[in-house]
């Protein structure tokens, strides 16, 4: 007799007539007049629970089995048999049931067996992974993360761990969380009356990172192909379905690569992970297509088969200006494209994923390579039907004099970036990279509308519970 996950039983990886033990939680209990109870037991290894058929001849049937309610944890031992009933191929003919943990009061159990609103589930984030929805999201999140690691490993990339605490603002936007151990009641002041960060833990003003990119570039300029994957932080006071204060970013950096190279890399990566999730999480994707977004599976299938369209920003603006559509946000050359603009291009004009390239320099970051026209930079966004921007990237500015000029234009102190500038002084090389917001990717795959519901414990303005 062996302990096996529910997934192994349901997916036929356990031989019929084998004695097994499964461990998990009760989803439902149903009793028949013939003295037989049916327990739906799940352990999170797959979407569906396994049915445990329990005869009233079990010694603890009246004392324990008939008291089991949703959420109780159990250890069930029995024989795997072909199920005569509808809905499952295999079930367990139970010979023993142990109760590992009771639900104290079934009447007040927050995860009672009924459909809960997504807003309610955010209030009980510590229990919401027990629901069908959040459990499925968690498994898809895992599968996507593993697929990303596999893809980059197969492509010869090295994974680099970049710091969460930094003194540099990658985006130059200033929306950063400060890290400090100073006594807020007795802040040290310098001669100008400003807070003296020399007295702080790191001896300077420090922040939570908004991106691992700058640090990643240093390793790309030594290992050639690297990627970072970890949490990043933005102190944006944005209460929208697309924003989190803490979220995960995947950021590859490639030496000797130009904008076209990383556009191709982005396309190959997305198609790889979408194929992986359709193959490995078919049960969860079926649920999303039935209960969340009917297009969840077909959208990914179309994406995998599609040829990416390519368009310059200038041409994209012309398309939008001449399309006859009245947009909520006006479109003209020099404005950053909004979500409605991006979705029009991907969903209605090209009807395919789109790579928009060569944006105006004034709306992009200092590190993006200035094009020969002096007005645009070698930046790109990948726009996906159904969501808009899913990836943003660029060729990095490898010319020190141009980089310094861009920093000056944006009011940045180049001395704060001395180590980043060193890359341009010692064997500089063309290099490129992009960033993928992991939660937006999960939302796109699952059809879940709000990124707060695809990360275990969302951090948003005025909310850091759990």
Curated annotation (Swiss-Prot):
Its EC number is 6.1.1.22. It catalyses: tRNA(Asn) + L-asparagine + ATP = L-asparaginyl-tRNA(Asn) + AMP + diphosphate + H(+). One of its GO terms (cellular component) is cytoplasm. Transmembrane segments: none annotated. It holds the Pfam family tRNA_anti-codon. GO terms for molecular function: asparagine-tRNA ligase activity; ATP binding; nucleic acid binding. One of its GO terms (biological process) is asparaginyl-tRNA aminoacylation. It is an enzyme of class 6 (ligase). Its main location: cytoplasm. InterPro entries: Aa-tRNA-synt_II (IPR004364), aa-tRNA-synth_II (IPR006195), aa-tRNA-synth_II/BPL/LPL (IPR045864), Asn-tRNA-ligase (IPR004522), Asp/Asn-tRNA-synth_IIb (IPR002312), NA-bd_OB-fold (IPR012340), NA-bd_OB_tRNA (IPR004365). It is found in: Cytoplasm. Keywords: Aminoacyl-tRNA synthetase, ATP-binding, Cytoplasm, Ligase, Nucleotide-binding, Protein biosynthesis. Homodimer. Belongs to the class-II aminoacyl-tRNA synthetase family. This is Asparagine--tRNA ligase. It comes from Escherichia coli O157:H7.
